[in-house]
Amino acid sequence: YGADVGGDIPMAVEFTRSLRPLLDAYGNAEGFHLIPFTMDETVYSRELAPLAGWYRGVYVGVPWWFIDEPDAMLRFRAATTGFATLYKTSGFIDDTRAFCSIPARHGIARRCDSSFLARLVVEHRITMDDAVRISRDLVGPIPRRAFKLD
């Protein structure tokens, strides 16, 4: 309920209709990148993942800096991976407001992503080699590409 106080309470949001004029004009344009973020879990699979799956320039913002609860992180991956794939997300990002907690937050994000990848391996949806490659990509190439840092 307030900026920078850790009281991040989700509010209902809508992206699909609101972004349609922008995405119709630029969503598949060379060099266009849009990374929407939200705490509204109902939007991930209904709006953001399909938008990222369809538009070349849309990536789903990974909300780890304000959703640092393991079950919510796993729900996010489950809700977005089918449409958007792991490669159309922003990867883990953080802010420096809670500087001392950043290593712990990165650690939990890596463990949750590894848990999600392990599930895909056990279900024979990806190979172990793929899981290892993806786990590396999630902390380097994926965020660098999404934020155009390469």
Features from the language model and the residues they span:
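Histidine/acidic residue-rich metal-binding segments in metalloenzymes
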Residues: 1-33, 42-58, 72-92, 109-118
